[in-house]
A protein has these predicted regions:
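Extracytoplasmic metal-acquisition and chelation regions
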Residues: 5, 9, 19-332
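Hydrophobic core
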Residues: 13-17
Protein backbone atom coordinates (compact mmCIF):
# COMPACT_ATOMS: atom_id res chain seq x y z
CA UNK A 1 0.00 0.00 0.00
CA UNK A 2 2.83 2.36 0.81
CA UNK A 3 4.38 1.64 -2.60
CA UNK A 4 1.07 2.38 -4.34
CA UNK A 5 0.71 5.69 -2.49
CA UNK A 6 4.22 6.74 -3.47
CA UNK A 7 3.54 5.85 -7.09
CA UNK A 8 0.36 7.93 -7.12
CA UNK A 9 2.20 10.85 -5.53
CA UNK A 10 4.95 10.58 -8.15
CA UNK A 11 2.41 10.61 -10.96
CA UNK A 12 0.70 13.70 -9.55
CA UNK A 13 4.05 15.44 -9.06
CA UNK A 14 5.13 14.60 -12.61
CA UNK A 15 1.87 15.92 -14.03
CA UNK A 16 2.17 19.08 -11.96
CA UNK A 17 5.69 19.73 -13.17
CA UNK A 18 4.65 19.05 -16.75
CA UNK A 19 1.82 21.53 -16.44
CA UNK A 20 4.22 24.16 -15.15
CA UNK A 21 6.65 23.64 -18.02
CA UNK A 22 4.39 22.90 -20.95
CA UNK A 23 6.60 24.65 -23.49
CA UNK A 24 6.22 27.81 -25.53
CA UNK A 25 2.45 27.45 -25.85
CA UNK A 26 1.84 28.08 -22.15
CA UNK A 27 1.00 31.65 -21.19
CA UNK A 28 3.68 31.77 -18.50
CA UNK A 29 6.44 30.82 -20.95
CA UNK A 30 5.17 32.88 -23.88
CA UNK A 31 7.74 35.60 -24.44
CA UNK A 32 5.62 37.54 -26.93
CA UNK A 33 4.15 40.92 -26.04
CA UNK A 34 0.86 40.77 -24.18
CA UNK A 35 -1.56 43.41 -25.47
CA UNK A 36 -4.82 44.09 -23.62
CA UNK A 37 -7.62 45.61 -25.70
CA UNK A 38 -11.18 46.70 -24.96
CA UNK A 39 -13.95 46.44 -27.59
CA UNK A 40 -13.90 43.70 -30.22
CA UNK A 41 -13.28 45.90 -33.30
CA UNK A 42 -10.07 47.18 -31.69
CA UNK A 43 -9.16 43.63 -30.66
CA UNK A 44 -9.63 42.50 -34.26
CA UNK A 45 -7.59 45.33 -35.77
CA UNK A 46 -4.83 44.74 -33.23
CA UNK A 47 -4.82 41.04 -34.05
CA UNK A 48 -4.59 41.78 -37.78
CA UNK A 49 -1.46 43.87 -37.21
CA UNK A 50 0.13 41.72 -34.50
CA UNK A 51 -0.37 38.42 -36.29
CA UNK A 52 1.43 35.69 -34.39
CA UNK A 53 4.07 37.98 -32.89
CA UNK A 54 2.00 39.25 -29.94
CA UNK A 55 -0.80 37.96 -27.73
CA UNK A 56 -4.01 39.98 -27.98
CA UNK A 57 -6.61 39.69 -25.22
CA UNK A 58 -9.90 41.59 -25.22
CA UNK A 59 -11.68 42.83 -22.12
CA UNK A 60 -15.24 43.83 -23.09
CA UNK A 61 -17.42 40.75 -23.76
CA UNK A 62 -19.07 40.71 -27.16
CA UNK A 63 -22.72 41.69 -27.07
CA UNK A 64 -22.12 43.96 -24.06
CA UNK A 65 -23.01 47.66 -23.98
CA UNK A 66 -19.48 49.08 -24.02
CA UNK A 67 -20.72 52.47 -22.79
CA UNK A 68 -21.90 51.07 -19.47
CA UNK A 69 -19.41 48.20 -19.12
CA UNK A 70 -17.73 47.84 -15.73
CA UNK A 71 -14.73 45.48 -15.75
CA UNK A 72 -14.78 42.59 -13.29
CA UNK A 73 -12.04 42.57 -10.63
CA UNK A 74 -10.23 39.68 -12.35
CA UNK A 75 -9.55 41.93 -15.35
CA UNK A 76 -6.97 43.62 -13.12
CA UNK A 77 -4.73 40.55 -13.50
CA UNK A 78 -4.67 40.90 -17.28
CA UNK A 79 -4.00 44.62 -17.00
CA UNK A 80 -1.19 44.05 -14.52
CA UNK A 81 0.52 41.61 -16.90
CA UNK A 82 0.00 43.59 -20.11
CA UNK A 83 2.91 45.16 -21.97
CA UNK A 84 0.53 47.46 -23.86
CA UNK A 85 -3.07 48.51 -23.21
CA UNK A 86 -5.10 49.66 -26.21
CA UNK A 87 -8.38 51.49 -25.62
CA UNK A 88 -10.61 53.59 -27.82
CA UNK A 89 -10.66 56.60 -25.53
CA UNK A 90 -13.05 59.50 -26.13
CA UNK A 91 -14.65 58.66 -22.76
CA UNK A 92 -15.85 55.23 -23.91
CA UNK A 93 -14.01 53.05 -21.38
CA UNK A 94 -13.31 55.25 -18.35
CA UNK A 95 -13.88 52.48 -15.73
CA UNK A 96 -11.46 50.18 -17.57
CA UNK A 97 -8.89 52.96 -17.88
CA UNK A 98 -9.17 53.67 -14.14
CA UNK A 99 -8.62 49.99 -13.36
CA UNK A 100 -5.65 49.89 -15.73
CA UNK A 101 -4.01 52.94 -14.18
CA UNK A 102 -4.25 51.36 -10.74
CA UNK A 103 -2.88 47.96 -11.76
CA UNK A 104 -0.58 48.25 -14.77
CA UNK A 105 3.18 47.96 -14.75
CA UNK A 106 4.99 51.29 -14.46
CA UNK A 107 6.32 51.15 -18.02
CA UNK A 108 3.10 49.94 -19.66
CA UNK A 109 1.35 52.59 -21.73
CA UNK A 110 -2.39 53.07 -21.98
CA UNK A 111 -2.92 54.16 -25.58
CA UNK A 112 -6.22 55.94 -26.30
CA UNK A 113 -6.30 55.38 -30.04
CA UNK A 114 -9.40 57.41 -30.85
CA UNK A 115 -8.13 60.36 -28.85
CA UNK A 116 -4.86 60.21 -30.81
CA UNK A 117 -6.35 60.10 -34.31
CA UNK A 118 -9.29 62.50 -33.83
CA UNK A 119 -8.53 66.19 -33.26
CA UNK A 120 -10.82 67.78 -30.70
CA UNK A 121 -12.07 70.13 -33.41
CA UNK A 122 -13.50 67.09 -35.23
CA UNK A 123 -15.40 65.64 -32.26
CA UNK A 124 -19.02 64.91 -33.13
CA UNK A 125 -21.63 65.56 -30.46
CA UNK A 126 -25.10 64.38 -31.37
CA UNK A 127 -28.25 62.58 -30.30
CA UNK A 128 -26.86 60.08 -27.79
CA UNK A 129 -23.75 62.16 -27.14
CA UNK A 130 -24.73 65.79 -26.37
CA UNK A 131 -21.90 68.28 -25.98
CA UNK A 132 -22.97 69.34 -22.49
CA UNK A 133 -22.13 65.84 -21.27
CA UNK A 134 -18.55 66.25 -22.48
CA UNK A 135 -18.49 62.82 -24.11
CA UNK A 136 -18.13 62.89 -27.90
CA UNK A 137 -19.39 60.12 -30.14
CA UNK A 138 -16.60 57.51 -29.83
CA UNK A 139 -17.50 55.23 -32.75
CA UNK A 140 -14.67 56.04 -35.13
CA UNK A 141 -14.05 52.46 -36.26
CA UNK A 142 -17.24 52.38 -38.36
CA UNK A 143 -15.46 54.70 -40.82
CA UNK A 144 -12.86 52.67 -42.78
CA UNK A 145 -10.61 55.72 -42.99
CA UNK A 146 -10.37 55.97 -39.22
CA UNK A 147 -9.96 52.19 -38.94
CA UNK A 148 -6.84 52.53 -41.09
CA UNK A 149 -5.57 55.23 -38.74
CA UNK A 150 -6.24 52.92 -35.77
CA UNK A 151 -4.17 50.25 -37.49
CA UNK A 152 -1.31 52.71 -38.03
CA UNK A 153 -1.25 53.63 -34.33
CA UNK A 154 -1.20 49.95 -33.37
CA UNK A 155 1.58 49.24 -35.88
CA UNK A 156 3.70 52.03 -34.43
CA UNK A 157 3.10 50.97 -30.82
CA UNK A 158 4.00 47.35 -31.52
CA UNK A 159 7.08 48.35 -33.50
CA UNK A 160 8.30 50.55 -30.67
CA UNK A 161 7.99 47.73 -28.14
CA UNK A 162 9.17 44.98 -30.48
CA UNK A 163 11.53 46.57 -33.03
CA UNK A 164 12.82 43.26 -34.36
CA UNK A 165 9.38 42.63 -35.88
CA UNK A 166 8.88 46.12 -37.34
CA UNK A 167 8.87 44.87 -40.93
CA UNK A 168 6.33 42.17 -40.06
CA UNK A 169 3.96 44.66 -38.44
CA UNK A 170 4.36 47.05 -41.37
CA UNK A 171 3.49 44.28 -43.82
CA UNK A 172 0.36 43.37 -41.86
CA UNK A 173 -0.64 47.02 -41.71
CA UNK A 174 -0.33 47.30 -45.49
CA UNK A 175 -2.57 44.26 -45.92
CA UNK A 176 -5.16 45.71 -43.55
CA UNK A 177 -5.03 49.10 -45.27
CA UNK A 178 -5.66 47.40 -48.61
CA UNK A 179 -8.71 45.55 -47.26
CA UNK A 180 -10.16 48.63 -45.57
CA UNK A 181 -9.62 50.74 -48.69
CA UNK A 182 -11.37 48.13 -50.84
CA UNK A 183 -14.29 48.15 -48.39
CA UNK A 184 -14.47 51.93 -48.54
CA UNK A 185 -14.48 51.87 -52.34
CA UNK A 186 -17.22 49.23 -52.35
CA UNK A 187 -19.44 51.36 -50.10
CA UNK A 188 -18.85 54.44 -52.26
CA UNK A 189 -19.83 52.44 -55.34
CA UNK A 190 -22.86 50.65 -53.93
CA UNK A 191 -24.36 53.75 -52.33
CA UNK A 192 -24.81 55.11 -55.84
CA UNK A 193 -27.53 52.49 -56.29
CA UNK A 194 -29.54 53.86 -53.36
CA UNK A 195 -32.48 55.99 -54.59
CA UNK A 196 -31.95 59.73 -54.39
CA UNK A 197 -32.72 61.13 -50.96
CA UNK A 198 -32.53 57.76 -49.21
CA UNK A 199 -29.05 58.00 -47.70
CA UNK A 200 -30.55 58.77 -44.31
CA UNK A 201 -29.90 56.81 -41.15
CA UNK A 202 -32.31 56.56 -38.28
CA UNK A 203 -30.84 54.26 -35.67
CA UNK A 204 -31.37 53.33 -32.05
CA UNK A 205 -27.75 53.85 -31.04
CA UNK A 206 -25.74 56.38 -33.06
CA UNK A 207 -22.64 54.46 -34.10
CA UNK A 208 -22.33 55.85 -37.64
CA UNK A 209 -21.80 59.59 -37.28
CA UNK A 210 -18.20 59.58 -38.54
CA UNK A 211 -19.00 57.13 -41.32
CA UNK A 212 -21.94 59.28 -42.43
CA UNK A 213 -19.81 62.41 -42.47
CA UNK A 214 -17.13 60.72 -44.58
CA UNK A 215 -19.53 59.20 -47.13
CA UNK A 216 -22.13 61.95 -47.44
CA UNK A 217 -24.93 60.18 -45.58
CA UNK A 218 -27.20 61.92 -43.08
CA UNK A 219 -27.93 60.64 -39.59
CA UNK A 220 -31.37 62.11 -39.04
CA UNK A 221 -31.85 60.67 -35.58
CA UNK A 222 -30.84 58.21 -32.90
CA UNK A 223 -33.54 57.09 -30.51
CA UNK A 224 -31.40 56.17 -27.53
CA UNK A 225 -31.20 59.00 -24.96
CA UNK A 226 -27.86 60.11 -23.51
CA UNK A 227 -28.44 58.11 -20.31
CA UNK A 228 -29.27 54.94 -22.31
CA UNK A 229 -32.80 54.80 -20.86
CA UNK A 230 -35.98 54.38 -22.90
CA UNK A 231 -37.01 57.49 -24.86
CA UNK A 232 -39.94 59.57 -23.68
CA UNK A 233 -43.35 59.32 -25.40
CA UNK A 234 -42.92 62.84 -26.78
CA UNK A 235 -39.54 61.89 -28.28
CA UNK A 236 -41.11 58.85 -29.93
CA UNK A 237 -43.98 60.93 -31.33
CA UNK A 238 -41.53 63.45 -32.73
CA UNK A 239 -39.54 60.65 -34.32
CA UNK A 240 -42.63 59.19 -35.97
CA UNK A 241 -43.40 62.57 -37.51
CA UNK A 242 -39.80 62.86 -38.73
CA UNK A 243 -39.77 59.41 -40.33
CA UNK A 244 -42.99 60.19 -42.19
CA UNK A 245 -41.73 63.60 -43.32
CA UNK A 246 -38.34 62.25 -44.42
CA UNK A 247 -39.90 59.18 -46.11
CA UNK A 248 -37.31 56.92 -44.50
CA UNK A 249 -37.68 53.38 -45.95
CA UNK A 250 -35.86 51.51 -43.17
CA UNK A 251 -34.97 52.25 -39.57
CA UNK A 252 -32.08 50.43 -37.97
CA UNK A 253 -31.71 48.84 -34.58
CA UNK A 254 -28.98 46.53 -33.40
CA UNK A 255 -28.49 43.16 -31.77
CA UNK A 256 -26.94 44.77 -28.69
CA UNK A 257 -29.74 47.33 -28.35
CA UNK A 258 -33.02 45.59 -29.27
CA UNK A 259 -35.78 48.17 -29.31
CA UNK A 260 -39.50 47.62 -28.96
CA UNK A 261 -39.85 51.37 -29.50
CA UNK A 262 -38.26 51.22 -32.96
CA UNK A 263 -40.61 48.39 -33.85
CA UNK A 264 -43.50 50.65 -32.85
CA UNK A 265 -42.08 53.50 -34.95
CA UNK A 266 -41.84 51.13 -37.90
CA UNK A 267 -45.45 50.03 -37.54
CA UNK A 268 -46.68 53.61 -37.13
CA UNK A 269 -44.83 54.91 -40.18
CA UNK A 270 -44.73 51.94 -42.53
CA UNK A 271 -40.93 51.92 -42.45
CA UNK A 272 -39.20 48.56 -42.26
CA UNK A 273 -37.44 47.83 -38.97
CA UNK A 274 -34.04 46.18 -39.42
CA UNK A 275 -32.77 45.01 -36.06
CA UNK A 276 -29.51 43.26 -36.95
CA UNK A 277 -26.87 46.00 -37.15
CA UNK A 278 -23.82 45.39 -34.98
CA UNK A 279 -21.95 48.23 -33.30
CA UNK A 280 -19.01 46.32 -31.85
CA UNK A 281 -20.27 42.72 -31.71
CA UNK A 282 -18.41 40.83 -34.44
CA UNK A 283 -20.46 38.42 -36.59
CA UNK A 284 -19.92 34.69 -36.34
CA UNK A 285 -17.84 33.06 -33.64
CA UNK A 286 -14.16 33.56 -32.78
CA UNK A 287 -12.14 31.78 -35.44
CA UNK A 288 -14.69 32.33 -38.21
CA UNK A 289 -13.42 34.48 -41.13
CA UNK A 290 -16.30 36.93 -40.73
CA UNK A 291 -15.52 37.36 -37.03
CA UNK A 292 -13.35 40.40 -37.72
CA UNK A 293 -13.50 44.15 -38.19
CA UNK A 294 -13.79 43.61 -41.95
CA UNK A 295 -16.59 41.07 -41.50
CA UNK A 296 -18.39 43.42 -39.12
CA UNK A 297 -18.33 46.41 -41.40
CA UNK A 298 -19.06 44.49 -44.59
CA UNK A 299 -22.17 43.09 -42.90
CA UNK A 300 -23.31 46.47 -41.57
CA UNK A 301 -22.70 48.40 -44.79
CA UNK A 302 -24.47 45.88 -47.02
CA UNK A 303 -27.39 45.76 -44.57
CA UNK A 304 -27.72 49.54 -44.67
CA UNK A 305 -27.36 49.84 -48.45
CA UNK A 306 -29.93 47.10 -49.07
CA UNK A 307 -32.28 48.48 -46.43
CA UNK A 308 -32.27 51.91 -48.05
CA UNK A 309 -33.16 50.51 -51.47
CA UNK A 310 -29.74 49.93 -52.99
CA UNK A 311 -27.93 46.88 -54.31
CA UNK A 312 -24.74 45.93 -52.42
CA UNK A 313 -23.05 44.29 -55.42
CA UNK A 314 -19.50 45.45 -54.70
CA UNK A 315 -19.82 44.78 -50.98
CA UNK A 316 -21.01 41.24 -51.67
CA UNK A 317 -17.97 40.71 -53.89
CA UNK A 318 -15.52 41.42 -51.06
CA UNK A 319 -13.91 38.18 -49.97
CA UNK A 320 -13.06 37.71 -46.32
CA UNK A 321 -10.10 35.39 -46.06
CA UNK A 322 -9.28 33.58 -42.83
CA UNK A 323 -6.61 35.20 -40.68
CA UNK A 324 -4.39 32.16 -40.20
CA UNK A 325 -2.49 33.85 -37.39
CA UNK A 326 -5.65 34.92 -35.51
CA UNK A 327 -5.20 33.99 -31.90
CA UNK A 328 -6.88 36.88 -30.13
CA UNK A 329 -9.00 36.23 -27.06
CA UNK A 330 -12.55 37.57 -27.42
CA UNK A 331 -14.56 37.40 -24.16
CA UNK A 332 -18.05 36.08 -24.77
Amino acid sequence: MRRTGFTAFAVVLTLSLAACSSGPDSASDDQRLLVATTVSPITSIASAIAGDRARIEGIVPEGTNSHTFEPAPQVAELLSDADLILVNGLKLEDPTIDLAQNNKKDDTEIVEIGTIVLPESDYIYDFSFPEEEGKPNPHLWTDPGYAIEYAAVIRDQLSELDPQNTTYYARNYTAFEKEATALSEAVASDQQSVPAGNLKLLTYHDAYAYFAEAFGWEVIGALQPKNFSDPSPSAVASLIDQVIAEKVPTIFGSEVFPSVVLEEVGRATGARYEDSLRDDDLPGAPGDPEHSWLGLMKYNFRTMVAGLGGTPTQLDAIAITPNTSEGAVYPQ
